[in-house]
């Protein structure tokens, strides 16, 4: 399984959520609403979830092993950092 596309929308809020992503797997399956979170130990991805009646959150879709989770997280965070650098370059170009 390969992550064949990552779409990312950065969010400018005061909270810990920094972006929302959608990924395409093997050009065949899309997962929306994956969140990029600024945690205590750095950035990580949180899979789409829904609140249960008792107030807990339950993942709607998630990888079943750590290797797959690593692939997904690596692809999303690479795109997050790429967009961050692009935004910096655009700001610098506009300032000069």
UniProtKB/Swiss-Prot annotation:
Keywords: Cell cycle, Cell division, Septation
Domain of life assignment: Bacteria
InterPro entries the record matches: SpoVG, SpoVG_sf
BP terms from Gene Ontology: division septum assembly; sporulation resulting in formation of a cellular spore
Purpose: Could be involved in septation.
NCBIfam families: PRK13259.1
Family membership: Belongs to the SpoVG family.
Entries under PANTHER family matching the protein: SEPTATION PROTEIN SPOVG-RELATED
Protein name, per record: Putative septation protein SpoVG
Native source species: Geobacillus kaustophilus (strain HTA426)
